[in-house]
Each structure stands twice: as C-alpha cells, then as structure tokens.
C-alpha cells in the first residue's frame, strides 16, 4: 500500500478462493479495506465478509489460505506502482540512503513482485509477513533493521500507510510519515497521528516538504560512512537467529 497498489490482484485471488469454496465473490473495495494485516487475516476476513473474523472456522481458514496463496502466486498483472515512488526511491539511492522494505505480505511474493515493478533493486533488506513471528504493529522489524544498518531511531524514518505502521514506528522511537493513500481499513491516516501526513512520496524531496514539519528526507542524507536508513513498509517476524539464516541481502 505504500509503494504499490496490489489490491486488484489480491481481490482476484480472494474471489478465486471464494469460488472454490462455493461462496460469492467479494467486492474490490471491501478487499481494499481488509488488506494490510497479512494473508491469513485477509483470508479470514474474506470468509467472514468483514473486518471481524473471530467466528471463522480454523480448518476452513487454513483451506482458504492454501487456495488463496495458490491463486495469488499465479498473477500480479494488475499491480501498479504509485505515482512518485520511483522518483523518490531513485533520489534516495543517489544520496546513499540505505532502504529496507517491511511488509505483511508473504515473503515468497515480496522480491519477485518488487522486481517485476522494477523497484526491488533499491532495497538492501526485504522482510515479509511470515519472515518472523511478529507482525506490525510490533516494532521488532524496525529495531532489527536499525541494528543491521547500524543506525539509531533518530537517524531513521518509517514511511507507511496504516495504523500498524504508525504504531510500529512509535514503539520503535522512529518518526513516521503517513500516506493518505494505501490501506488503512477505511480510516483516515490523520487519525493515527503520524509525525507527518502527505499525499505523495515526492512531498518529502528537497524543496517540496512543509518547513513546519521539521522532517525531510534530506535530513537523512547518508554520511560518508553511510549511517542512514529509511525503512519503508507497505509491510522482523521470526526469531533473530532464523532471520539471520534466511536474510535477503540486496547488493
């Protein structure tokens, strides 16, 4: 939701899953409100027909998840990059800023999807929703990225589009920029009180930011020893030792 709009493909996979289970398809806008908390929660919400999903049978949910994952793996043709994303990532890379992608999307889809969108090369680290046990709003992912990059919360910025992103950033002591587009279950991102709210990532580039905020990507420009990082969600969930064993390094 921060970098790409993958809802059309997610909705198509949800509908195929529901069809296999003999259920009516979901509305695209309903799926847009359901995404953001990982594939398991999305499937349970689709089966429940709403945000609340506690009553969904666990066996049915597992069956639905398998069908959904199979369907989603087959096509990402409807996914698009949001305006301003490539310009911003390109600028950051030129400044030597190290970037990480932290998403609740299943890990197996993350790198191939970003490479298909031609933005995977910008990220040194990629963390999927099943890489570690903890998902956002747990701050573990942010803390681990900062440890790997050798930076402090004051040197970092987290950019996201949801309540989970804002809560994770606050828990990690990192300033958070909230985007007005993306997936926040129909709630305005202003309600989550991030450090700054913008409509387009390019608003953070030099000369575009609001001086009153005191936050710019220029402030995070890397020093000669590259001690800066920007963690970009859309979406560190596993024990640290397992994470180290499976870590996705990007040259």
Swiss-Prot record:
GO cellular component: cytosol
Gene Ontology terms, MF aspect: metal ion binding; phosphoglycolate phosphatase activity
Cofactor(s) in the UniProt record: Mg(2+)
EC class of the enzyme, as a word: hydrolase
A single GO BP: glycolate biosynthetic process
Binding site for Mg(2+): 161
Catalytic activity from the UniProt record: 2-phosphoglycolate + H2O = glycolate + phosphate
S-S pairs: none
Keyword line: Carbohydrate metabolism, Hydrolase, Magnesium, Metal-binding
Pathway stated in the Swiss-Prot or TrEMBL entry: Organic acid metabolism; glycolate biosynthesis; glycolate from 2-phosphoglycolate: step 1/1
SUPFAM superfamilies in UniProt: HAD-like
EC numbers on record: 3.1.3.18
The keyword Hydrolase is annotated on this UniProt entry: yes
Statement: the UniProt record of this protein carries the keyword Iron: no
Family per similarity comment: Belongs to the HAD-like hydrolase superfamily. CbbY/CbbZ/Gph/YieH family.
Record's function text: Specifically catalyzes the dephosphorylation of 2-phosphoglycolate. Is involved in the dissimilation of the intracellular 2-phosphoglycolate formed during the DNA repair of 3'-phosphoglycolate ends, a major class of DNA lesions induced by oxidative stress.
HAMAP family according to UniProt: GPH_hydrolase_bact
Identification of the protein by name: Probable phosphoglycolate phosphatase
Record lineage: Bacteria, Pseudomonadati, Pseudomonadota, Gammaproteobacteria, Pseudomonadales
């Amino acid at each position: 939701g921060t970098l790409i709009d993958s809802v059309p493909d997610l909705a198509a996979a949800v509908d195929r899953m529901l069809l296999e289970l003999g259920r009516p398809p979901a509305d695209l806008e309903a799926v847009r409100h359901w995404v953001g908390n990982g594939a398991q929660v999305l499937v349970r919400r689709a089966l429940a027909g709403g945000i609340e999903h506690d009553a969904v049978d666990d066996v049915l949910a597992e069956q639905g998840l398998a069908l959904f994952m199979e369907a989603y793996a087959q096509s990402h043709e409807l996914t698009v990059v949001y305006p301003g994303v490539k310009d911003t990532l390109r600028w950051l890379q030129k400044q030597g800023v190290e970037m990480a992608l932290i998403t609740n999307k299943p890990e197996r889809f993350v790198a191939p999807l970003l490479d298909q969108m031609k933005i995977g090369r910008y990220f040194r680290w990629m963390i999927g929703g099943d890489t570690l046990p903890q998902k956002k709003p747990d701050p573990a992912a942010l803390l681990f990225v900062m440890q790997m990059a050798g930076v402090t919360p004051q040197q970092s910025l987290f950019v996201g589009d949801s309540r989970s992103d804002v809560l994770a950033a606050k828990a990690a002591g990192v300033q958070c920029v909230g985007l007005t587009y993306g997936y926040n279950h129909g709630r305005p991102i202003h309600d989550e009180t991030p450090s700054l709210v913008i409509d387009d990532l390019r608003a953070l580039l030099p000369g575009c930011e609001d001086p009153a905020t005191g936050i710019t990507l220029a402030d995070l420009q890397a020093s000669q020893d590259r001690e800066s990082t920007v963690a970009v969600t859309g979406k560190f969930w596993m024990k640290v030792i397992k994470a180290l064993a499976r870590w996705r390094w990007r040259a």
